[in-house]
Amino acid sequence: KVLSQNLNKDQKKDFCITHFFNPVRYMGLLEIVKNEDNDLNKINQLKEFCEVELGKGAIVCNDTPGFLGNRVGVYAMQIAMTEAFKMKLSVEEADAIFGRPMGIPKTGVFGLYDLIGIDLMADVLKSFIKELPKSDEFHEVAKEIPLVKKLIETGYTGRKGKGGFYRMKKTDSGKIMEAINLETGEYSTSQKIDIKSDKVDLKALINRNDKYGDYAWSVLSKIIKYASSLVPGITKEFNDIDEAMRLGFNWAK
């Protein structure tokens, strides 16, 4: 709406947004953001071109904050983070669960935060808070976390900074990976969490009678609930959400 506000009605018919996910060379998702004045035949032609000629997975969505992929993806990251704090999990435990066992890349949530940039994620959250209505559940997971604020203030912004939730420490015997304690803010040697992810399917994971099962179900159920609430506001098809997460965030399930 902002980009097209000075266009006349005929111009608006031919105006839409194409949002490529980074890195463009590797990520398959391309969001085509339409407006209420668009000629749908032209939108469909553009979609076909993007799929056939560019080899992208093109999804048509409405003009809403974050479009489709980031709206769900950022919410998922935030709920995974806030639940880890709430349930007193370690960053390694959270990433071991909110990772391959759930069909999500092994970076999990805290590893992904470090990869994107903790400071950049803070800016993304501010944008969502500003643009989304107060009734949107996103506000509940976008509240400032003191430890995250401290990391940014001290230059621990992720891989591009001095470290983040994880950091590499140089020792006489070489480099070791350390992880931050979410309660104390202190770093210690990162621990490998073995939940036999190669043998645990999603159903078995959420049915576990332990903190890992509780965490997995709490996160998954909230993501599904939130994603479902976005239909038909962002898209008319539930399958579009699945495709956006598969192509834009490499979710396999």
Language-model regions, residue ranges each:
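N-terminal glycine-rich phosphate-binding loop for ADP-containing cofactors
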Residues: 1-253
